[in-house]
Regions:
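C-terminal catalytic/motor cores of large multi-domain enzyme assemblies
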Residues: 1-180
Length: 180
């Protein structure tokens, strides 16, 4: 999926952005917003990535993620993070997010409950990746060590029910497991 020649090499959040955008195809309800009492269905998937700065938390947005290659996402994301950290991010790069990803894995957090970035419908919380013993064959109960990452989805029940949200997570899980 990723080659070493890429510059920059995509970070986990870049890969997750692409996989989230693909997963939202099957659950467009999560790509909505409640604006002035109206449910707005977004055509584009614009994903914000939470970024901790000396000035507080900011959420720069990669626009139209579905139409971009992983390499382009990685390039844009790296530039956004750099500008955010430097305090030079243009305000328009903080606008029009339709879904947010937040990652606390670098702080050794396994799982957490993220708070929705309103007016968006949902936010995906990403925990650290850790090796764990898991059953790899349910028929024989064979175990093995696999790298596991917890995902926490917080969503607005006014906009989407639990079933579609669970379907989104199921699709995302499947895509992550297939990605090498």
């Amino acid at each position: 999926y990723v080659t070493e020649q890429w510059d920059p090499v995509p970070a986990y959040h870049d890969i997750l952005m692409k996989l989230v955008a693909d997963s939202l195809r099957g659950c467009p309800e999560l790509n909505t917003a409640l604006i002035e009492g109206n449910i707005v269905q977004h055509d584009l998937v614009n994903i914000g990535v939470t970024t901790d700065t000396e000035r507080g938390l900011l959420v720069p947005v990669v626009h139209d993620v579905r139409s971009k290659s992983l390499q382009v996402i990685a390039e844009e994301s790296a530039k956004l993070v750099e500008q955010t950290q430097a305090g030079t991010l243009p305000l328009d790069k903080l606008r029009e997010g339709t879904f947010t990803i937040t990652n606390l894995g670098m702080y050794d957090i396994d799982a957490f409950t993220p708070i929705i970035n309103l007016p968006e419908c949902a936010i995906l919380g990403v925990g650290r990746i850790v090796p764990k013993v898991v059953v790899v064959d349910e028929r024989t109960l064979t175990t093995g060590i696999r790298r596991i990452m917890a995902l926490s989805l917080t969503f607005d029940h006014r906009l989407v029910d639990g079933g579609p949200a669970a379907k989104f997570l199921q699709t995302l899980k499947s895509l992550i497991e297939k990605t090498q």
